[in-house]
């Protein structure tokens, strides 16, 4: 059974996963912004666990990073 986690913990996990994938694929914030049409400031907020990603952003990030959405986000928990 899945457990609930606080939003800030979920955001921290997302930020870590995004940073790992981004740098391992040779992206920096500017190049990822160009590849996804997500503003550089928004990517910075994601990396600093300051903003919840939209579904559209998750799709665009997954496409640019050549990964599944499940590699970016944790589907095993509900967020509170």
What are the residue ranges of the model-derived segments?
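A short, Lys/Arg-rich alpha-helix, primarily the initiator
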Residues: 1-28
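The alpha-helix within a helix-turn-helix
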Residues: 22, 33, 62
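Residue-level detection of the helix-turn-helix DNA-binding "recognition helix"
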Residues: 23, 37, 48-50, 77
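DNA major-groove recognition helix of helix-turn-helix/homeodomain DNA-binding modules
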Residues: 56-71
């Amino acid at each position: 059974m899945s457990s609930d986690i606080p939003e800030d913990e979920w955001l921290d996990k997302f930020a870590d996963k995004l940073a790992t994938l981004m740098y391992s694929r040779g992206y920096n914030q500017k190049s990822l912004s160009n590849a996804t049409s997500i503003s550089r400031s928004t990517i910075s907020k994601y990396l600093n666990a300051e903003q919840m990603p939209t579904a559209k952003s998750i799709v665009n990030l997954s496409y640019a990073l050549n990964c599944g959405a499940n590699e970016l986000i944790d589907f095993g928990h509900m967020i509170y």
